[in-house]
């Protein structure tokens, strides 16, 4: 069963967002993802349930979907737009996946697109394409296609848009980890990077 999405605009004040950012950056471990000679993103991970991070939980917990447990928490600093993927599967994780949660840490001229298409077991969009038996037809509005120039045009013919999330500071978006999703090409819109709190939840 797929979960209903939750979207709340401007849920957290600017002061609260700054507090979250500062608290997380004080306790996080930073790693970089580099491929083909360029850095795609930095990930600032922290242990959500560590006693030292109680102040972070006190801010976030009241707004999380009921019956969820956080199994990964990090600030994502994206330097290149994410392509099509789901978050359903992660190495060593045998729990039942629930939500991906995004909380932007600033205002950005950027959107996350969630598509109606999903996968129960794989993050890789190529796996979905291999099993696809439907008609290849462009069902995405042309104005949206123009924001997805980092994707292969043919891939868009497998997809239809479920919902769109605007990256505004302190907003909250939770959607089922099984759905394929991606960023727009925010570089084309003039943004050099973007940062957000990302949480992955599983069944308790």
Question: Where in the sequence are the language-model features?
Answer:
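Catalytic core of non-heme Fe(II) oxygenases with the double-stranded beta-helix
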Residues: 79-178, 184, 189-204
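Non-heme Fe(II)/2-oxoglutarate
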Residues: 1-74, 79-84, 118
